Amino acid sequence: GTYPPVVLATLXRTH
């Protein structure tokens, strides 16, 4: 992935 873990965590949160 090209996104850092922080972004992934945020996406998971909003998902």
From Swiss-Prot:
Q: What is its EC number?
A: 3.2.1.118
Please write the reaction equations for the catalytic activity of this protein: (R)-prunasin + H2O = mandelonitrile + D-glucose
- What does the UniProt keyword field contain? Glycoprotein, Glycosidase, Hydrolase
What's noted about post-translational modification?
Glycosylated.
Organism equals Prunus serotina (Black cherry)
Protein name in the entry: Prunasin beta-glucosidase 2B
Q: Which domain of life is it from?
A: Eukaryota
Lineage, please? Eukaryota, Viridiplantae, Streptophyta, Embryophyta, Tracheophyta
Molecular functions per Gene Ontology = prunasin beta-glucosidase activity
- Subunit structure, briefly? Monomer.
